[in-house]
Amino acid sequence: MQTTTALRLYGKRDLRLETFDLPEMRDDEILASVVTDSLCLSSWKEANQGENHKKVPDDVATNPIIIGHEFCGDIIAVGKKWQHKFQPGQRYVIQANLQLPDRPDCPGYSFPWVGGEATHVIIPDEVMEQDCLLAYEGETYFEGSLVEPLSCVIGAFNANYHLQEGSYNHKMGIRPQGHTLILGGTGPMGLLAIDYALHGPVNPAMLVVTDTNNDKLSYARKHYPSEPQTLIHYLHAQDAGYDTL
């Protein structure tokens, strides 16, 4: 039996760091360690809403869940059902948004034995059935933890669209060598968005990034300068009027 130390949610603003034994792994489950888990404001929202959050079970006060959904680690043991696909010693990441057809359950929100804020977890069958346990071959664990937030950035870029003149067709994604504006873009997710705009498959000719914090703007300006294909302008929101933009 594997012992774990985890941060568990019992209700609104009721988080407890506890050490306890995980149950025996079933044949359709996977036992894994967690090495890194990055912080997400979605977890802050979850902790504040507790049982009122749509992904948190109503009985969380008596059946707590482990929070954290941006995690990366090592597979320790694999149940018989999944031994054809996963092996002990593999690194993994989880796509936490399972998109189950009948309920909103997700790791880090809904399950008692899996979440990023833990030393060891049991990954339930639903994660593998939804093809949301991914073998990870990156160089560092922390980069694995960034897979989930980066997927959100990519989704946002892909959700942009432009109308084609003279038709009702929607062209999805940002416009190649067009103009892109990122508002409030020097926080963690904003920096990921800047990085993706510069180094992703489609690059704008001009990228404008605004924020209200001069220190953050200076940090972004230093670490993400213009590239040959993309000119970047960093602007304080007070200076980013209609005429300027």
Q: What do these predicted regions represent?
A:
Residues 23-38, 52-101, 114-115, 127, ...:
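Glycine-rich beta-strand-centered segment in the early N-terminal region that forms part
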Residues 177-178, 183, 196-245:
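Adenosine-nucleotide cofactor-binding segment
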Residues 78, 149, 184-186:
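Glycine-rich Rossmann-fold phosphate-binding loop(s) that bind the pyrophosphate
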Residues 45-53:
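Short Gly/aromatic-enriched secondary-structure transition segments
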Residues 96-179:
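NAD(P)H dinucleotide-binding glycine-rich loop of Rossmann-like/cofactor-binding domains
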Residues 152, 188-189, 216:
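Hydrophobic/small residue at the entry helix of a nucleotide-binding pocket
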Residues 1-7:
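Short structural boundary motif marking the start of a folded domain
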